[in-house]
Structure formats: C-alpha cells, structure tokens
Amino acid sequence: MARYIGPKCKLARREGTDLFLKSARRSLDSKCKIDSAPGQHGAKKPRLSDYGLQLREKQKIRRIYGVLERQFRRYFAEADRRKGSTGELLLQLLESRLDNVVYRMGFGSTRAEARQLVSHKAIVVNGQVVNIPSFQVKAGDVVSVREKAKKQVRIQEALGLATQIGLPGWVSVDADKLEGVFKNMPDRSELTGDINEQLVVEFYSK
C-alpha cells in the first residue's frame, strides 16, 4: 500500500478531526470543514456500525502517525505481546518512532517533515546518524540535528513555533544545540484525548 500524498484536508474531513498533518502555522481548523464529509457538497456522514467506528478509529490513528497498514498491524501485534494495556502500549510504540520524536522535539513542523529529515540523514541518535523513520527511540536517548543540517531555515522555524506552543513533558530540548532528550515514554494521560485506542484493540480482537 502506497503512502497517501493527496490533500490533507480530505483526510481530516473523512476522520472528522484535525490529524495534525499540517504545521500549527497552517492549522486545518479554520480552513477545512472538518464536520463535513469529503466531496464538493460534503455529503452527510452515515451512521456507522460498531465495526465501522473501530475501522475509522484505526485509520485515524494510523494517519496521524503516518504509518502504513502493514506497519500498524505489526505495532499492534507487538503491543499485544507485551504485558500491560495493549492500547496504551500501541500508542507508546508509535510515539517512540524516531520521526515522531523528531516532530515532538520541534525539529519538524509536521510528522511528514520530520520523517523527511530522518530519511535525508539530518538526524543523529546518540552520536550516530539514523535514517530509519521507524527506529525505536528509548528513554534517555539523545536526538539531535546533524551539524550540516542545523542551518536549515525550516528546522529553525519549526522549533521556534513548537517552543511557543509548548513541548511535551516527555522530551527536553536545548534550542541552541538543536539537541533533545527522550526522557521517558509518555503516560496515556499526556497524549491527546481525541484518540480512542480501545476501539483499535476491539477491531483487531475480532
């Protein structure tokens, strides 16, 4: 399955919520009719069955983190294998992806931009260049922008905006060094409440 490269607004309208696919500078809230379904006239959304709700939630979370279906299924299998709340563990696995950590630290204005920085070898983890977006970051890992990439205007602008909005509590960032520490896995209470991961658990448990 190829990665979706079409209009971001269309996806947000389909899921009925901002998927954070654009930077905070260009928030979808004011530009997309999120309450309307995709299409010229925004057809009325049909009432969904339990299965439909579970499927939509899975698709929403998958799109927020920019993960393909096969990858997402593997993350769920790994979360289900571990001890603890499967839904919360799933979110933690997604949150600890390198591209997501780069985004959370403010080095990329969107997860897609952060993924590009990683793929283009602009990111260093514990002193080593890592170009795999799905690389799993561990508590205590130091993530920084590679020296030759530090002058990129988009990185400076993204970090400036992220600092204004506020960085999450599970990362710390030195803006002067363009370096951050992944302090710990986030608790469920620290993540957005607009996600119902239990529906995903129910979807895969059928």
Curated annotation (Swiss-Prot):
Gene of origin? rpsD
| Record-linked PROSITE patterns | RIBOSOMAL_S4 (PS00632), S4 (PS50889)
Q: What is the name of this protein?
A: Small ribosomal subunit protein uS4
Quaternary context: Part of the 30S ribosomal subunit. Contacts protein S5. The interaction surface between S4 and S5 is involved in control of translational fidelity.
Q: What does this protein do?
A: One of the primary rRNA binding proteins, it binds directly to 16S rRNA where it nucleates assembly of the body of the 30S subunit.
- Which family does the record assign? Belongs to the universal ribosomal protein uS4 family.
What Pfam families is this protein classified in? Ribosomal_S4 (PF00163), S4 (PF01479)
One GO cellular component this record assigns the protein to is: small ribosomal subunit
One GO MF term, please? structural constituent of ribosome
**Record domain S4 RNA-binding: where:** 96-157
| Gene3D superfamilies attached to this UniProt entry | Ribosomal Protein S4 Delta 41, Chain A, domain 1, RNA-binding S4 domain
Write out the entry's keywords from A to Z: Ribonucleoprotein, Ribosomal protein, RNA-binding, rRNA-binding
For this chain's UniProt record, which GO biological process terms are given? ribosomal small subunit biogenesis; translation
Q: Which InterPro entries match?
A: Ribosomal_uS4 (IPR022801), Ribosomal_uS4_bac-type (IPR005709), Ribosomal_uS4_CS (IPR018079), Ribosomal_uS4_N (IPR001912), S4_RNA-bd (IPR002942), S4_RNA-bd_sf (IPR036986)
